[in-house]
From Swiss-Prot:
The modification N-acetylserine is found at S2. Interacts with GRH1 (via C-terminus), probably forming a heterooligomer consisting of a GRH1 dimer and a BUG1 dimer. It comes from Saccharomyces cerevisiae (strain ATCC 204508 / S288c). The gene is BUG1. It comes from the Eukaryota. The modification Phosphothreonine is found at T292. Its main location: cytoplasm. Keywords: Acetylation, Coiled coil, Cytoplasm, ER-Golgi transport, Golgi apparatus, Membrane, Phosphoprotein, Transport. The keyword Metal-binding does not apply. This is Binder of USO1 and GRH1 protein 1.
Amino acid sequence: MSEQESDEVKRMKQLEEARKRVEELKKKKNKKNKGKKNKNSSATGSIGSETPDLEGTPGEESTQEETVKANSTKSENNDQNDVDEESEEKEIEQVKSDPSGTTEKDIEEINSTSSNVGKDDAENTKKEEVQEVIKNNNDEQTADAGKTIEPQEEKKIVQTQEGNEPSNTSEAADDLFANDGNEESDFLTTIKKQKEEDELTKLRAENEKLTQENKQLKFLNMENETTVDDLQDQLQEKEDIINGLQNDLQTARDELIAAVEKLKLAEAKAARNTTATPIQFADFNTSSNNLTPSQSVTNSGTQVAHGNNMEVDRVMLNKWRQWNVDMTTWRSIGSGPIMEF
């Protein structure tokens, strides 16, 4: 069995127990009411038997004794009714106070049973009031009979009072039924008020939670705004640095381009200023072979000096730079003339 089925079974059992309790209370009340009726009938019989003795006694003493007896019976009946009602209310409240087993339908059923019990109580109280009124009237009639000793007039008075009693009892019944309706309405209103109070407490708790969450979100929003501002400031600083570096790079590029252009112009000017010189071959004499070593050294020195004073073609040298060697002043090994390349 599932949890729902077990809960339903528990509720049904509790309802059956409540109904049984209400029925038992009804039976107890009916028994008590029957006992009260028997007591009242015995009291009326005793009063009727005492009426002939009252003829010789004064009327005031008899009326006082009878009123005292009636008041004592009323107080006893009222005390018993109060005790019964308190016990019933306690049991009904115990049934209603079970939060796990009772629902709205169950409460309505219990209320209907309690209202029926209240109606029965009202009817019983009405009957008791009628009996008390009859007793009082009988007492008054006996007092009048003791004074006047006119049984025929007593019968007429009893008949007239009995004719007036139904109207009084109907009014009392209307008042009692109205009170029962008010009790039911009061019970329902209390339930509604309790529900409204519960809803209000829930809504207040939710409102408090939402307000706290709103405050937390506001603080988070403020923190996020501050972090965003800081990041924006940092980004602005980085952008300024980048812009400065870009400007420096642009100026460096411009300077480099200007330097390259100047170098090109200088090279062009140097190329224009240089004049091409023809290749000159050295004049070799045959007598040079017969020269002495000292003479050959002097001749080579003069040739070297002459070669240094020569103007060299820079264009040709640049063309053969780094892979050709200038061998114009070199002397070949062996015999033969010295040639200039």
